[in-house]
């Protein structure tokens, strides 16, 4: 088993490769202990020819299992190290003109670049299967008998010309050691090697983990630190989780971990099981490989009887599922000595990989979506001798991760925004201006004040903020921004500057301006009040701030975002008002509707099926027309705002005429700086932004190019019950003050930009050269997949935790966990559970995505959800029922857990926690009764007829204290009689459902009644851990202290109970003197405690079975069958039950011909221009 799937991504970051598929460039460092990753695609070696004996003389060195996991994880992470830096590239227009200062200028005939990507980064090939359960031996003999066993192999009859002793040892040596003479028990127990590094402690075969569920830990449990219920419940969950993670592996059988035995030779059992078979090494022990033991013929006889009755045992490769055209095997059915729970989990993993096959078109369309229009991407043909196996996430899964990730952490929005900003800046098509245009204006008395004001407003937000705001327009609005409503404390020129500033903000950032509409419109209204008080008065009287006559109360962001109040500036025709009409006309959106064509073709995650978006910067096209409607609106804003303010200032009451003359000069300078903003915004800014809209992470937007339309209702994460009182977490955070925008940024866009494409030599041409760095599709795709992976790393633990507490999931061990916890989880406990799951996933080498990073979660949010869903919510309270017009993710369910993970989790939980499971060591129910026994065995039933006893349920009222003669006496009060002498108590079956707060005096009285054999105490709800000890009856300790301990157990404790086996006695132990033939036994299990025993009592040689001998069950020896999709059935054709132990099972394995990395080579020639969408 090894590290796990990484379901939050389709692709690994690209690598540069040569035409042979080898990685070139600055490859990531490779540890000397880690095999170098090869990118070549070559024909695998054909199946090796059959030989008579291919078993080597030495077993492979047993690797440390934790190292195996980490090695597999590290090999996967080698593929995602930081890509080597790339030289900045720019591309020329078809004219072929060059420009100094740029390193590369290409043409339409540029050569192809060759790259490689791995499209299945979460497959995990391993060369060894470590089962979750293994066999453990309990000996009953000392060295005297062991020496007889040690000489056994020397007396095995065999033909050395046919089979060598070391070959027998390879196949059967481990089994012969385990099932050897002098063995008391061979039992099935959890495998410490499998769970190495999992921070699980096994006590009597029951897993314990650090406490998740704190409420059950009390001071009374202090003396039983490893035995409180919460530790066991935690242990069960962490066991099942690690089981699910570590069985998500793919066994690859190669020459190094396999061998073959000749089919022509004549073998006897057990070697005949592997005759002519290709087997997987190392061979795990099994009782069927212990056959042929001349010292214990009774064991052979028992096994022979099973084979006669139709039990079939198999080991090695049985058949080939798929093969190459040349006949080389790709996938196979192989039988191993592993438990059926592990085998069933591996079957689930194989099924998931088998049904989700690589599709070439998907990969090509994804790469094209991350390429500029006009780029060429060609996938290079893979080797026909290989077959790809792996999983690719569906758009629904990726969308689920993004939405829930956003609900769990605000870092998701910030990370997506940063990725968009970095990708935008990568193009290199816009940069900060190195010149100061305002400094070039000749100073005079009229312009110094306005220059100072503009510099002051420009200083509040620089070039990086300006670019970030541009990137925000394509980033999903997961956190809504606002603009602060300012007090009316501006006068003079500031009124003009602020009026123009707010108008320009709507032109440059239309989608952000709409979301900030409350603050911006409040500020507009205040400016109108200061510039034209009469117009403001008429507006309030005849219209009102929000269309309500006479209403001049400022609109809050909360009211605006919930559509409770909307500014009249957006919703009402104000053309009858001169200033307000001008504002309304200038802030009206301009642009065009476009669609995410490439994203739709690539089937990227999108909230809506048809994804139109508003493009505020129309592309000027290949002719590079400067006079675009966007540039015209900018110039119009400067001209008409100045003209109107001049008209309002005819008497100079607002601004002196000298200052107004200076304003005209400064505005002319600003308009000159807008000279290239038509092509600059339409192509050099607009086209990179249009490219970003097709990326995976930009999965939705809500701006429709209109100011008068209301906002959609808020998306939230809710429980499946959708009760108004259930917890809700906003996916879109609409909360004032989360992001505050500075409108002064517009002066940076006006005065502080330069477009490298426009630095042409005007004597040569006026055609702007298109210079930019083209994106590298595989690299950019890998970056976005990493973000989705980080979302998944937060979502999967959350969704697993939600699944664990789901009320609909109440079987397969979950019932036992709920009984152990006896209550619902608090918010803190649920967070603890998520944290433990997250740690387990990272510690085991499992990462849902290619990245170990996890977004920091919002600590104040209550995360307890039952089957979380995404729904629209009105006013953060009312959940709106989905309609057919809603997006599919709103109408349907989230897909958060990687396919196969929860079925494997439930398999593991059923096996270890279900009270009816033979694998589980947690037992429930005890009898306390004194009976005399000569010898005892753990599975002995209570030898009493309980029909002779009157059943009474224990309560405090059962006891009374009365004065008897001169002293107070404690006794049982039953049917009007008081019994204070234990010997006189009537025969009673006392059912104790809880011993919580049972007085010590009551416990002592019960003990005396037990001594007198008057009562039987039944503890039906008591969970306990059991172990079996083989000992002589003389050595067995008295059980009275243990009985008192059981009566004192609190509800938050689980006791350890030892059961003794005195049937199997070491004959070398001698006792002097006489001993009674019987012993008092007090503790009896209600149900069997030895279901996990494979064999018992191998304490004698010969053909006669010793007392207490128990052979393995049929199911333990029944290999059954496995179909091509991983389903395990018994020999009778019934699906194998994970609660019934089976120790021989089939698995689907792969050969070296199976491509589990999904490495794909592709050729890429980037576009040379930014002229087309």
Curated annotation (Swiss-Prot):
GO cellular component: T=2 icosahedral viral capsid; viral inner capsid
Positions with biased composition (Polar residues): 33-53
Superkingdom of source: Viruses
Family: Belongs to the turreted BTV-fold inner capsid family.
Keyword Transmembrane: no
Localisation per UniProt entry: Virion
Cross-referenced InterPro entries: VP1/VP3_C
Function: Inner capsid protein that self-assembles to form an icosahedral capsid with a T=2 symmetry, which consists of 120 copies of VP2, with channels at each of its five-fold vertices. This capsid constitutes the innermost concentric layer of the viral mature particle.
Listed name of the protein: Inner capsid protein VP3
A Pfam family assignment: VP1-like_C
Subunit organization: Homodecamer; each decamer is made up of two conformers of VP2, called VP2A and VP2B. 12 homodecamers assemble to form an icosahedral capsid.
Residue pairs linked by disulfide bridges in the UniProt entry: none
Region (Disordered): 1-53
Keywords: Capsid protein, Inner capsid protein, T=2 icosahedral capsid protein, Virion
Keyword Metal-binding assigned: no
Compositional bias per record (Basic and acidic residues), positions renumbered to this chain: 9-21
Protein's organism: Rice ragged stunt virus (isolate Thailand) (RRSV)
């Amino acid at each position: 088993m090894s590290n796990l799937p990484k379901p939050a991504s389709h692709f690994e970051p690209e690598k540069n490769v040569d035409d042979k598929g080898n990685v070139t460039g600055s490859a990531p460092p490779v540890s000397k202990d880690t095999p170098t990753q090869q990118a070549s695609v070559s024909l695998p070696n054909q199946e090796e020819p059959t030989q008579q004996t291919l078993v080597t003389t030495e077993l492979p060195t047993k690797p440390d299992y934790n190292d195996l996991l980490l090695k597999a994880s590290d090999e996967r992470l080698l593929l995602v190290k930081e890509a080597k830096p790339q030289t900045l590239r720019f591309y020329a227009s078809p004219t072929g003109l060059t420009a100094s200062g740029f390193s590369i200028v290409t043409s339409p005939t540029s050569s192809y670049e060759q790259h490689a990507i791995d499209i299945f980064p979460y497959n995990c090939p391993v060369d060894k299967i470590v089962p979750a359960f293994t066999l453990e031996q309990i000996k009953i003999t000392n060295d005297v008998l062991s020496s007889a066993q040690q000489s056994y192999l020397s007396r095995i009859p065999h033909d050395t010309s046919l089979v060598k002793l070391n070959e027998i040892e390879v196949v059967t040596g481990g089994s012969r050691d385990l099932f050897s003479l002098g063995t008391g028990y061979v039992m099935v127990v959890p495998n410490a090697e499998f769970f190495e590094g999992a921070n699980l402690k096994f006590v009597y075969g029951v897993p314990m983990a650090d406490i998740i569920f704190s409420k059950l830990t009390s001071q009374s449990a202090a003396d039983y630190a490893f035995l409180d219920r919460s530790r066991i419940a935690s242990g069960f969950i962490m066991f099942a989780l690690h089981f699910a993670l570590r069985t998500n592996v793919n066994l690859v059988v190669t020459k190094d971990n396999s061998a073959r035995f000749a089919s022509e030779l004549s073998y006897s059992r057990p070697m005949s099981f592997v005759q002519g078979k290709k087997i997987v090494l190392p061979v795990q022990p099994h009782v069927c490989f212990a056959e042929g033991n001349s010292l214990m013929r009774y064991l052979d006889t028992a096994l022979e009887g099973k084979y006669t009755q139709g039990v079939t045992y198999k080991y090695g490769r049985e058949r080939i599922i798929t093969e190459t055209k040349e006949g080389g095997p790709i996938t196979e059915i192989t039988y191993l000595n592993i438990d059926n729970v592990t085998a069933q989990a591996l079957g689930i993993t194989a099924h998931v990989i088998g049904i989700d096959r690589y599709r070439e078109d998907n990969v090509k369309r994804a790469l094209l979506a991350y390429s500029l229009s006009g780029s060429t991407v060609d996938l290079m043909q893979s080797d026909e001798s290989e077959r790809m196996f792996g999983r690719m996430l569906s758009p629904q899964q990726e969308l689920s991760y993004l939405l829930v990730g956003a609900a769990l952490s605000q870092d998701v929005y910030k990370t997506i925004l940063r990725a968009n900003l970095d990708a935008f800046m990568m193009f290199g098509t816009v940069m900060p201006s190195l010149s100061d245009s305002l400094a070039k204006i000749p100073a005079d008395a009229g312009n110094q004040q306005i220059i100072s004001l503009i510099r002051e407003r420009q200083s509040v937000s620089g070039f990086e903020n300006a670019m970030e705001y541009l990137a925000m327009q394509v980033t999903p609005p997961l956190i809504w921004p606002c603009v602060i409503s300012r007090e009316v404390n501006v006068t003079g020129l500031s009124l003009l500057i602020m009026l123009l500033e707010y108008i320009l903000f709507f032109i440059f950032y239309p989608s952000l301006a709409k979301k900030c509409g409350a603050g911006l419109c409040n500020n507009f209204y205040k400016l109108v009040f200061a510039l034209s008080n009469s117009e403001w008065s008429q507006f309030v009287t005849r219209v009102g701030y929000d269309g309500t006559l006479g209403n001049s109360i400022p609109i809050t962001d909360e009211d605006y975002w919930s559509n409770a109040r909307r500014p009249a500036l957006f919703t009402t025709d104000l053309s009858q008002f001169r200033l307000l009409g001008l504002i309304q006309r200038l802030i009206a959106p301009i642009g065009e509707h476009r669609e995410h064509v490439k994203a739709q073709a690539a089937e990227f995650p999108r909230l809506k099926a048809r994804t139109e978006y508003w493009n505020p910067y129309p592309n000027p096209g290949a002719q590079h027309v400067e006079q675009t409607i966007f540039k015209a609106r900018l110039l119009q804003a400067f001209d008409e705002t100045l003209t109107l303010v001049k008209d309002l200032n005819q008497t100079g009451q607002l601004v002196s005429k000298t200052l107004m003359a200076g304003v005209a000069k400064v505005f002319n300078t600003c308009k000159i700086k807008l000279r290239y903003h038509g092509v600059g915004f339409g192509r050099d800014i607009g086209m990179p932004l249009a490219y970003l809209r097709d990326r995976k992470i930009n999965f939705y937007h809500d701006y429709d190019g209109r100011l008068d339309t209301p906002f959609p209702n808020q998306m939230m994460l809710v429980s499946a019950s959708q009760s108004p009182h259930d917890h809700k977490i906003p996916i879109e955070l609409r909360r004032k003050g989360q992001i505050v925008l500075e409108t002064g940024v517009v002066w940076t866009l006006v005065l502080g930009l330069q477009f490298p494409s426009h630095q042409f030599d005007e004597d040569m041409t006026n055609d702007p050269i298109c210079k930019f760095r083209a994106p590298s599709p595989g690299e950019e795709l890998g970056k976005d997949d990493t973000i989705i992976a980080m979302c998944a790393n937060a979502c999967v633990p959350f969704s697993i935790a939600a699944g664990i507490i789901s009320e609909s999931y109440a079987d397969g061990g979950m019932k036992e966990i709920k009984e152990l916890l006896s209550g619902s989880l608090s918010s803190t406990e649920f967070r603890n559970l998520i944290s433990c799951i997250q740690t387990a996933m990272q510690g085991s080498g499992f990462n849902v995505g290619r990245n170990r990073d996890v977004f920091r979660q919002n600590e104040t949010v209550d995360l307890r959800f039952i089957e979380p869903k995404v729904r629209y919510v009105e006013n953060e309270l009312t959940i709106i029922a989905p309609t057919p017009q809603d997006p599919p993710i709103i109408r349907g369910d989230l897909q958060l857990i990687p396919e196969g993970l929860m079925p494997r989790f439930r398999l593991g939980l059923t096996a270890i926690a279900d009270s009816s499971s033979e694998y589980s060591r947690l037992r429930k129910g005890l009898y306390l009764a004194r009976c005399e026994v000569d010898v005892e065995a753990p599975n002995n039933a209570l030898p009493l007829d309980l029909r002779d006893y009157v059943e009474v349920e224990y309560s405090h009222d059962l006891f009374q204290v009365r004065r008897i003669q001169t002293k107070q006496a404690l006794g049982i009060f039953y049917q009007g009689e008081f019994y204070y002498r234990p010997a006189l108590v009537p025969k009673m079956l006392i059912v104790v459902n809880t011993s919580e707060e049972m007085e010590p005096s009551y416990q002592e009285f019960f003990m005396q009644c037990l001594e007198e054999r008057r009562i039987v105490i039944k503890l039906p709800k008591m969970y306990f851990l059991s172990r079996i000890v083989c000992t002589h009856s003389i050595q067995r300790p008295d059980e009275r202290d243990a009985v008192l301990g059981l009566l004192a157990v609190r509800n938050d404790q689980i006791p350890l109970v030892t059961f003794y086996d005195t049937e199997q006695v070491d004959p070398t132990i001698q006792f002097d003197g006489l001993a009674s033939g019987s012993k008092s036994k007090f503790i009896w299990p209600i149900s069997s405690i030895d279901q996990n025993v494979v064999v018992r009592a191998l304490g004698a040689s010969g053909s006669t079975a010793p007392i207490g001998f128990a052979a393995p069950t049929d199911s333990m020896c029944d290999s059954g069958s496995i179909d091509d999709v991983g389903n395990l059935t018994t020999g009778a054709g019934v699906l194998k039950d994970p609660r019934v132990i089976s120790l021989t099972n089939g698995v689907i394995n792969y050969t070296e011909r199976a491509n589990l990395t999904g490495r794909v080579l592709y050729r890429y020639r980037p576009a040379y221009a930014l002229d087309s969408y």
